[in-house]
C-alpha cells in the first residue's frame, strides 16, 4: 500500500468517516483566501498538521456539502507521508490524533481505515443517502424549539399531504435526466442519475424537545438514495415535493417537471433551506463507519 516520495519514506492513504453540524461552516470544502469563511476541511487540515507528514495533508472529500448542510457520516481520503524509517500510522492512531487536535466541537472523526494508494473517496463510493427534515405546525419561525433550530425546515402550515408527496416521489425513482433539479454553477455535463430509493415518512423530534413543546409540531423525514447526486438536486427535489404536500402542485406535475429538463422553471428553481439537509451515509464495498 505504500509508495516512496522522499527517499526511504512511505506514503500511506487513509479513508476517514466524519460527521459535522454544518451551521457554522461555509460548506465542507476548505476555503482559501477568505478569512471570514471557513470549511470543515480547514479544521481537519489544521489538525492533520500534528501528524507531521513530510508533505502537507490534504483531504479529498467524498461528497461536497453546502454551507449549513450537516453530515451524519461523510467520508474523505488523505495521504500521510512519514519520515524515512518511520512506520505508517495505524488507522486508530490517525482517527484519535485528528479528534484530539480538532479545534471545533461540531466536527468528529468517526473511524479511519488504511486503503490502497489508488483508492478515491469520491469515485469508489457505491451509495449516498441524504435525509431532509421538515417540521409542520409552526405559526412563526421562532416557535421552533431551541434544540430543533438549524436542523429542520419549519413550515408555517399545519398540514402536509403525505400521500400526495409519496405519490409524487415515485415519479423521481429510477434512471432519469435530472437536469431540471440541478442548480447553476456545476461543471457536471452528464445529468443522468439513478435514484434508487425515495421515501416520505413521519420522523422523530429531537429527544431534547419537551413533550409540551412539541405537541403542536409534527416532524417529517424525506430520504433519497443514489450513487451520486447533482448540485443541489436533493434540496430542489425536496422543495418540489413540499409544494405537492402544500397543494401547490399535483403529484403528476412532478413528472412533467422532471421531463422538462428545465432547471429555471417556476417550481423546480426553488431550493429548500440548507439547514434541514443531512448527508446520512456514504457507502463503500469494504469500508464503513460501523465496520
Curated annotation (Swiss-Prot):
In this record, what's one Pfam family? PseudoU_synth_1
What's one GO MF term for it?
RNA binding
- Cellular component terms per the entry's GO annotation: mitochondrion
Q: Which residues are involved in binding substrate?
A: 130
- List this protein's GO terms for biological process: pseudouridine synthesis; tRNA processing
Query: Which keywords, in A-to-Z order, does the entry hold?
Result: Isomerase, tRNA processing
Q: What InterPro entries would the database entry show?
A: PsdUridine_synth_cat_dom_sf (IPR020103), PsdUridine_synth_TruA (IPR001406), PsdUridine_synth_TruA_a/b_dom (IPR020097), PsdUridine_synth_TruA_C (IPR020095), TruA/RsuA/RluB/E/F_N (IPR020094)
EC number(s) stated in the UniProt entry for this protein: 5.4.99.-
The lineage's top-level taxon is Eukaryota
Which SUPFAM superfamilies does its entry note?
A: Pseudouridine synthase
The positions flagged as active site in the entry are: 66
Catalytic activity field: a uridine in tRNA = a pseudouridine in tRNA
| UniProt family annotation | Belongs to the tRNA pseudouridine synthase TruA family.
Name recorded for this polypeptide: tRNA pseudouridine synthase-like 1
Its lineage reads: Eukaryota, Metazoa, Chordata, Craniata, Vertebrata
Amino acid at each position: 500500500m505504500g509508495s516512496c516520495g522522499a527517499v526511504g519514506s512511505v506514503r500511506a492513504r487513509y479513508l476517514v468517516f466524519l460527521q459535522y453540524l454544518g451551521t457554522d461552516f461555509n460548506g465542507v470544502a476548505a476555503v482559501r483566501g477568505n478569512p471570514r469563511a471557513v470549511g470543515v476541511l480547514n479544521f481537519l487540515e489544521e489538525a492533520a498538521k500534528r501528524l507531521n507528514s513530510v508533505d502537507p495533508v490534504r483531504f479529498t472529500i467524498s461528497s461536497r456539502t453546502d454551507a449549513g448542510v450537516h453530515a451524519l457520516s461523510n467520508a474523505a481520503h488523505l495521504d500521510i507521508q512519514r519520515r524515512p524509517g518511520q512506520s505508517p500510522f495505524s488507522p486508530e492512531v490517525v482517527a484519535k490524533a485528528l479528534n484530539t487536535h480538532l479545534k471545533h466541537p461540531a466536527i468528529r472523526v468517526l473511524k479511519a481505515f488504511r486503503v490502497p494508494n489508488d483508492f478515491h473517496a469520491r469515485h469508489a463510493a457505491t451509495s449516498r443517502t441524504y435525509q431532509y427534515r421538515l417540521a409542520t405546525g409552526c405559526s412563526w419561525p421562532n416557535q421552533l424549539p431551541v434544540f430543533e433550530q438549524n436542523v429542520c425546515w419549519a413550515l408555517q402550515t399545519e398540514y402536509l399531504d403525505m400521500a400526495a408527496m409519496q405519490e409524487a416521489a415515485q415519479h423521481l425513482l429510477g434512471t432519469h435526466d435530472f437536469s431540471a433539479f440541478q442548480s447553476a454553477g456545476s461543471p457536471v455535463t452528464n445529468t443522468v442519475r439513478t435514484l434508487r430509493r425515495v421515501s416520505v415518512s413521519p420522523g422523530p423530534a429531537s429527544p431534547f424537545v419537551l413533550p409540551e413543546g412539541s405537541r403542536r409540531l409534527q416532524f417529517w423525514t424525506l430520504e433519497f438514495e443514489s450513487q451520486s447526486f447533482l448540485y443541489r438536486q436533493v434540496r430542489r427535489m425536496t422543495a418540489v415535493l413540499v409544494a405537492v404536500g402544500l397543494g401547490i402542485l399535483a403529484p403528476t406535475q412532478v413528472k412533467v417537471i422532471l421531463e422538462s429538463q428545465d432547471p429555471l422553471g417556476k417550481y423546480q428553481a426553488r431550493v429548500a433551506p440548507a439547514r434541514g439537509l443531512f448527508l446520512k451515509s456514504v457507502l463503500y464495498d469494504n469500508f464503513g463507519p460501523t465496520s
